[in-house]
A protein has these predicted regions:
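Solvent-exposed, polar/charged alpha-helical surfaces in well-ordered, non-transmembrane soluble domains
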Residues: 124, 128, 132, 238-242, ...
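Short, glycine/acidic-rich hinge or "gate" loops at secondary-structure transitions
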Residues: 139-164, 262
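Internal, well-ordered alpha/beta segment that forms a basic, Gly-enriched binding/recognition surface
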Residues: 85-89, 100-101, 118-138
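Sequence/fold signature of self-assembling virion shell proteins
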Residues: 2-51, 114, 159-191, 269, ...
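Sec-exported extracytoplasmic/periplasmic mature domains
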Residues: 131, 135-139, 143, 245, ...
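Disulfide-bonded cysteine-rich modules in secreted/extracellular proteins
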Residues: 190-210
Length: 450
């Protein structure tokens, strides 16, 4: 007589296996720990307190007793982790065929991963692969995450949310937004010159009223923004701007546009940064017309000017705040900047300064400060941000960059089961994540804005 319910539990999928083959590679690998500080066990919102160092406390004693002086400056921000998830499935037949087909002779059932008892090949082979893919996603989103990210076609936002990046806010987005808002002072940002003169894309659309005009519509980056006709062409365009400006400028982060009303009945559209591109069109319903003027084509940054990385890193060190001198600082920069620096050194027939050990690896230095080259930045600037601002550098301390997650202690972070009907071993991973930097005084940037 067969059982109504049946369950198998082999191979034993233990928390130890999860920790050894998944959590440690994904959240504890040196590629993470060497860049940032990871804070775990944040399940929702946590307050990050910043206590300013007191000074000027000691005064001349001119009378009996004491007179208190000075105080602490306490500021804080909240960090709220956002839920993330990935799912992976694998059929045993394909797994064996690709990796260890010869082990079938030992008695394994090729369609049932559950029978892999000795050795625990599945956990030892597949979990690290999943962990590596998950970590690649984590690092990409850690830097380039943007809740307003949109899918891109030929460098132009499509109006469709890009869930490869929209889960939470990454460091690049923090830096760009806070430079624009002057939260990070302009003195802590260094402009980077390239061999190509860069330009923003620009266009002006001017409405001419028609006797039967009922509404206007301007499409920007595949999204239509409409406005009912008001008392005049000028009033209509002003109303359009008041209605849509905030929504339009909140889109797509560094790949977005700025809209203004430079003159009567006109709307000017400009890419947010040099090299950014956009699509647009305008029409009047029921009569009237639009005329386009002031057209400027976008020109992206080209190769770096000769010796530009050397000049940039030197300028970044000149911009270091007094507070930064108290910490171990590290440069992070794109591969394009690294190659430019190498060319400079070759031309001068000099070599890099002494290498230092960082997280068990020898890394080059610039004036004694370690350099971490991030070729992944080059890749994702091209893919996720249309290649605008391709040369970037960051100088900070790892203690200042914070990645918050609930992952390493969440007992429900990873699930696994074998679906007998589909003959698939499935894994589901979920964690919460968010990034923040603690102190604007501990950051110097280069190449992030115009």
């Amino acid at each position: 007589m067969s059982n109504i319910f049946s369950q198998t539990t082999s191979p034993a999928f233990k928390r130890q296996a999860v920790d050894e083959y998944f959590i440690q590679p994904m959240f504890m690998a040196e590629d993470i720990r060497g860049l940032i500080t990871v804070r775990t066990d944040i399940k929702g919102t946590e307050t990050l307190n910043r206590i300013g160092r007191p000074s000027m406390l000691t005064k001349p004693k001119v009378s009996p007793g004491f007179t208190p002086a000075g105080g602490f400056n306490l500021t804080y921000t909240d960090i709220t982790v956002k839920p993330m998830a990935l799912e992976f499935e694998q059929n045993a037949r394909a797994f064996w065929g690709a990796i260890v087909e010869q082990l079938l002779a030992s008695g394994y059932r090729e369609d049932d991963v559950e029978q892999m008892k000795s050795p625990d090949v599945w956990n030892k082979v597949m979990l690290p692969l999943i962990a590596q893919a998950g970590q690649d996603d984590l690092i990409r989103q850690m830097f380039f995450g943007n809740p307003h990210a949109e899918t891109m076609v030929a460098g132009v936002p499509t109006g469709t949310a890009d869930d490869n990046y929209s889960g939470y806010t990454g460091f690049m987005t923090h830096f760009h937004n806070d430079l624009i808002a002057a939260t990070i002072p302009a003195a802590q940002h260094v402009a980077i010159a390239s061999g190509t003169t860069q330009y923003k894309q620009e266009s002006i659309e001017t409405l001419t009223y028609g006797a039967t005009t009922t509404k206007i519509g301007i499409t920007i980056n595949n999204v239509l923004y409409e406005q009912a006709y008001a008392s005049s062409a000028a009033a209509t365009m002003t109303a359009w701007l008041n209605t849509h400006k905030a929504t339009i400028e909140a889109r797509a982060g560094i790949n977005g546009v700025i809209v203004t009303n430079p003159s009567s009945a006109a709307i000017k559209i400009v890419s947010r940064v040099k090299g950014g591109v956009f699509t647009h069109s305008a029409e009047a319903t029921g009569g009237g017309s639009f005329a386009e003027t002031g057209v400027v084509a976008a020109v992206k940054s080209g190769a770096l000017a000769d010796n530009e990385t050397d000049k940039t890193l030197e300028s970044m060190l000149d911009a270091v705040t007094p507070e930064m001198h108290e910490h171990d600082l590290t440069f992070m920069l794109t591969a394009t900047m690294w190659r430019n620096l190498i060319h400079t050194l070759k031309d001068r027939q000099t070599i890099l300064g002494d290498a230092v050990m960082k997280n068990g690896l020898k890394v080059p230095t610039y004036e004694g400060f370690p350099i971490i080259v991030r070729p992944d930045w080059d890749k994702w600037i091209s893919v996720a941000q249309g290649g605008v601002k391709p040369h970037r550098a960051l100088l900070t301390t790892s203690k200042n960059l914070l990645f918050a997650t609930d992952g390493t202690s969440d007992s429900e972070m990873i699930e696994t089961w074998y679906n007998q009907e589909a003959q698939m071993r499935r894994y589901r991973v979920q964690y919460k994540a968010q990034t923040a930097y603690l102190h604007k005084e501990l950051i110097v940037l280069a190449g992030f804005i115009d």
